[in-house]
Structure formats: structure tokens, C-alpha cells
A protein has these predicted regions:
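Long, contiguous binding/interaction regions
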Residues: 1-61, 65-67, 71-104
Length: 104
């Protein structure tokens, strides 16, 4: 049986960028490449080093929301399958450590 599972995930990454806007753009682009239909919300963008540089280090916290379609008989199995599918999508990226949970 095909089921739609609503999920949300939160993560934090550190990256080098030319400014706040570049850091935001990089994170949003990378997340949308892994999960095109997700809603991306950037929660916090902060410089990790106090002194200014041409290329700065940033820490970005974000939240993702969306639905994942899976094949499963039970709701509990559908949630597990959705989390597994998301972990596979983000494996090998700097976003591989997102904490996932079911919504609703």
C-alpha cells in the first residue's frame, strides 16, 4: 500500500562562504538538490570566527519539511521507510546528520 508520510528534519552545517547571503544560498541549493519538494527554512546563520576575511566560516541551522511516498502496510513501517529513504538521499553530503521525525 502506498502511503504519504509527513516529516520534518533539523540540521546544522558549517561551511565557507563569501558572506551571509552566499552561505544561505549554498545551504538552500544543496538541500533542494537532495530533496526538491521540501520546504526549507533557515533558522540561524552565524559567523564562526570573529575576525573578518574574504571567505568566512559560517554555521547554518535549518529545518526541512515535506512528504515522502513509500510502500508499506502499516503506518509505523511507513515512517521507518520514509526515514530510511531520507537518510539515503542525504548520505554522503554535509547534511547526512539531519535529525528526522514524523509530523502529526
Amino acid at each position: 500500500m502506498r502511503r504519504e508520510v509527513a516529516v520534518r528534519g533539523m540540521g546544522r552545517v558549517e561551511l565557507a562562504a563569501y558572506g551571509v547571503a552566499d552561505a544561505e544560498h549554498q545551504v538552500e541549493r544543496e538541500l533542494r538538490e537532495c530533496w526538491p519538494g521540501a520546504r526549507v527554512e533557515l533558522l540561524e546563520v552565524a559567523r564562526t570566527l570573529p575576525e573578518p576575511r574574504i571567505v568566512e566560516e559560517f554555521a547554518v541551522r535549518y529545518r526541512l519539511r515535506g512528504t515522502v511516498a513509500v510502500e508499506a502496510e502499516r503506518e509505523e513501517d511507513a515512517r521507518r521507510a520514509a526515514f530510511r529513504a531520507l537518510r539515503e538521499r542525504f548520505a554522503g553530503t554535509r547534511h547526512a546528520r539531519i535529525a528526522w521525525e514524523a509530523e502529526g
